[in-house]
Amino acid sequence: MKKCLLMLPVIHADETVLQVNKEPGRTPQQESRIWAYSSSKRSKHQIRLFQYEMSRKGACATNFLEGFRGILQTDGYSGYGVIGEIIRAGCWAHMRRKWLEAMPKGATVENSKAAKGYEFCGRIFDVERKLEDLPDAERAVKRQELIKPIIDEYYAWIETIFKPSGKLKDAVTYAVNQKEFLCTFLYHGEVEASNNQVENAQRGVVVGRKNWLFCDTPKGAEASVIAYSILETAKANGLNPEKYLMHIFTVLPDRFAKNPNADIEDLLPWNDKIMELCKLGV
C-alpha cells in the first residue's frame, strides 16, 4: 500500500503523540509519535498508513516519503520544510482554528479581529463547498476566479493589524508564515482546502488511545500502526474490517508458506474481488 501511496499526486500528512513505555535509552514519559499519511479525497484508491517513530523530526517524514514527487498537504509544522522535491499545501482548517482560539467570549466581526479572520476563512469554505464536484482543472480556474479575491482581501486586511499580541499574534503569524502553502490549492484543483482528510483518518487512533493509553514496547507500537493501517484503509474503501481481516488471515499464511515473496495485489482493499467479498452490508 505504501508503494501505491507514493505514486499518487497528493498525500496528506499529520502526526500525533504516542507513549511507549520501554524504548531503549528513553523514559516512559518521553513522547514518541504516530505519523499518519493519507491519499486525497479524490484518489480512486483510498489509503491510510501509520508509522511509529520515536521523534517528531521532519526526517521521519522525509524517510517515509522517499521517492514521492507530488503535493504534500499538512498543517503548519515546520518539520515538513526539510522534505525536498515536493510542493507543499497548507490547511485552511488550521488557519480558521487559530482565529477561533484567539476569539474572546462574545466576539463579533465588529469588535474582534479574530472574529473577522474567522469570518474570512468561513467565506473561503463556503465557496469551496460549491466547487467540490468540479473536475480538477475547472476547480482550479474557479478557485482563482472566486476564492483568490477573498484571499487577497484577507492578506490586505492582515497587514492592517498593528502589533497583535497573545493568541491573536499567533493567528497573524500563522497566516503570514503559511501564505505560500495556503495558496497552493488555488492553482491545483486536485488539492483540498484543508488537511481534514488525514485528521479524520487519525480519529481511530486518537479515540483508541483514550482507552489503551500507551504501547508497552516498540514492537507493540509497530504492531499497532500496522493494524491501524490495515483497518483504516479497509474502512476508507467501504469494507467490513472484520470480514477483510478474516479473509486475508485465511489466505496469507498458505500463500507465504509457498512463496515468502508472493504477490498480494489481489488482497488490496480496492481489489474488485475483495470489494465483492468484504464490502459493508454484504
Predicted segment positions?
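Catalytic center-proximal scaffold of phosphoryl-transfer enzymes
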Residues: 1-282
